[in-house]
Regions:
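Ubiquitin-like/PB1-type beta-grasp interaction modules and other compact soluble beta-rich domains
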Residues: 1-85
Length: 86
């Protein structure tokens, strides 16, 4: 089962957890399953049109990946939200 590693402000939407084991065969599947388990996360990673939000990046094995990237059992998918300020 893939492991999702959450950073920064994303953690607050999953009860403060920084890592969660989630099923799925693509990054999109994994995020959909994660959102089903943690409804407060909906809209923070993927927008209403199903696109990755501009301030969020996904990484697998140190490489940036898209929502359509395959995710294998044992992979770690890092969801990283950018920090901004002024």
């Amino acid at each position: 089962m893939p492991k999702v590693i959450l950073t920064g402000s994303i953690c607050q939407h999953v009860g403060g957890l920084s890592a969660v084991d989630v099923s799925g065969t693509t990054a999109r599947d994994v995020i959909t399953t994660l959102e089903a388990s943690y409804p407060a996360l909906r809209g923070w990673v993927v927008d209403e049109q199903g696109a990755l939000r501009r301030h969020v990046k996904l990484f697998r094995g140190g490489e940036a990946v898209s929502l359509d990237a395959p995710i294998a059992p044992g992979d770690e998918l890092h969801i990283v939200a950018a920090i901004s300020g002024g």
